């Protein structure tokens, strides 16, 4: 008698572990089966369907026996093995599509990823491509991480997401952006193991990383309000490099990312480098990134936070030359000047180099002025072309008119008609003079006077 209750308990445990099959039927005619656990919720079922159909779960509506499924467990709603669910399409009309915020697009793109895609991406086995929508504009972001390797060998075109206090040098990323606004930095973290064909080598320098914001969508909201129109759909690819040894400065770096260089290759296509360290709450006890979409979201969030700290344009050859000259002059001044002399002899070349660097460093205001000047020239040229087009249209219309009543053309007509008969000339002059009476008197030849 005492052994009988143990048998149904084991049976119930086995029954709980066995999944149940659901028949999903859409109103458009699509039918397929989906295997879910017995304790699955409505939200989890919508997430599975959205991952399979590549549709945001907010646009999915499920019906079971004419009842809309909104929340709760499937078993509590009377859904069992072999149940049939109806999938309704979501139709948007009017300006509803423009009301979606950028952070919703990011979250929808991340939530549509399967667990296999997230694991393969974070482990570096395969790249990940996200399609982001901001209003009526699309932007494709390709992310790729390098597989973490043990040992201190030099890794080229790879990077490792590490903890800021326990790992080595922070990773450097090279990015290729697709938009022309602050949101363009979102399409950035795509380091890969193979160099892309559309990317030219750029320089990278180490700087202190800014403080990263928490894992929320507030940064997406703040940057999404002032975005400008994005460019056309251009796929992105990146690569990165990592140093060999760690330094005390790199160990003490705060979690986050910082953009080090930025190059505009073409309208809507950008490349650059940035370095950063993953936040500790996105890592496990061994320092590896967590297999979750929150890790990907943190990387994007750190990049958006880095855009606010990045000011200025990419360093040109002149700027790099100025920095090199200043460093060499300062080193020579410190080596050659005796310690007994005052600081006046050493501060002059350094101050001169600083002024030279200040003049060589391009600023954002200068770029904006150049863009405004180019836009103004384009507008003036368009106005000139439109004015010429109006003049040609007016001349064409005047040539087709049966009579020419413009007073400014009277003298030209009288001079051209001087070879005609005197009767016709006198009639035309008397007729026009009686109507218009221009201020400038026409020159009359002798034949008109005789008539």
Swiss-Prot record:
Every Ubiquitin-like domain range: 20-94
Species of origin: Xenopus laevis
Compositional bias ranges of the Basic and acidic residues kind: 363-372
Superkingdom of the organism of origin: Eukaryota
Intracellular or extracellular location(s): Nucleus; Cytoplasm, Cytosol; Nucleus, Nucleolus
Annotated GO CC locations: cytosol; nucleolus; nucleus
Compositionally biased tracts (Basic residues): 388-397
Listed Low complexity bias regions: 190-205, 237-250, 336-347, 413-426
Protein name: Midnolin-B
This protein's UniProt keywords: Cytoplasm, Nucleus
Function (record text): Facilitates ubiquitin-independent proteasomal degradation of polycomb protein CBX4. Plays a role in inhibiting the activity of glucokinase GCK and both glucose-induced and basal insulin secretion.
Pfam families for the chain: ubiquitin
Designated gene of the protein: midn-b
Region of interest (Disordered), ranges: 187-254, 331-372, 388-427
């Amino acid at each position: 008698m005492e052994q009988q209750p143990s048998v149904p308990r084991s049976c119930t445990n086995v029954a709980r572990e066995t999944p149940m099959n659901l028949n999903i039927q859409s109103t458009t005619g699509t039918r397929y089966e989906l295997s879910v656990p017995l304790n699955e919720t409505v939200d989890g079922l919508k997430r599975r369907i959205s991952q399979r159909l590549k549709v945001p779960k907010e646009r999915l509506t499920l019906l079971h026996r004419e009842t809309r499924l909104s929340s709760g467990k499937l078993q509590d709603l009377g859904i069992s093995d072999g149940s049939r669910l109806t999938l309704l399409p979501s139709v948007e009309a009017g300006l509803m599509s423009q009301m979606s915020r950028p952070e919703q697009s990011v979250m929808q793109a991340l939530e549509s990823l399967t667990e296999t895609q997230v694991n393969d991406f974070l482990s570096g086995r395969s790249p990940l491509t996200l399609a982001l929508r901001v209003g009526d504009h699309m932007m494709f972001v390709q992310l790729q991480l390098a597989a973490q390797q043990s040992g201190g060998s030099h890794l080229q075109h790879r990077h490792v997401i590490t903890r800021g206090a326990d790992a080595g040098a922070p990773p450097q990323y090279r990015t290729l952006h697709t938009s022309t606004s602050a949101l363009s930095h979102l399409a950035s973290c795509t380091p890969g193991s193979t160099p892309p064909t559309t990317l030219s080598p750029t320089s990278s320098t180490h700087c202190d990383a800014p403080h990263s914001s928490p894992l929320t969508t507030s940064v997406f909201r703040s940057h999404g309000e002032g975005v400008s129109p994005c460019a056309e759909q251009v796929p992105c690819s990146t690569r990165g490099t990592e140093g060999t040894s760690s330094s005390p400065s790199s160990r003490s770096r705060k979690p986050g990312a910082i953009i080090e260089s930025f190059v505009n290759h073409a309208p809507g296509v950008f490349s650059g480098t940035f370095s950063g360290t993953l936040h500790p709450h996105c890592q496990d006890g061994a320092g590896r990134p967590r297999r979750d979409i929150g890790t990907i979201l943190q990387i994007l969030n750190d990049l958006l936070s880095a855009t606010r700290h990045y000011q200025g344009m990419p360093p040109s050859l002149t700027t790099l030359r100025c920095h090199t000259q200043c460093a060499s002059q300062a080193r020579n001044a410190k080596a050659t000047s005796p310690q007994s002399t005052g600081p006046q002899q050493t501060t002059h070349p350094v101050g001169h180099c600083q002024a030279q660097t200040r003049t060589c460093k391009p600023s954002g205001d200068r770029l904006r002025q150049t863009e405004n000047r180019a836009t103004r020239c384009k507008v003036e040229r368009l106005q000139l072309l439109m004015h010429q087009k109006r003049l040609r249209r007016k001349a064409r219309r005047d040539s087709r008119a049966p009579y020419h009543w413009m007073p400014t053309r009277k003298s030209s007509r009288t001079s051209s008609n001087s070879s005609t008969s005197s009767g016709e000339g006198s009639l035309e002059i008397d007729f026009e003079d009686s109507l218009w009476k221009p201020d400038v008197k026409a020159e009359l030849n002798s034949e008109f006077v005789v008539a």
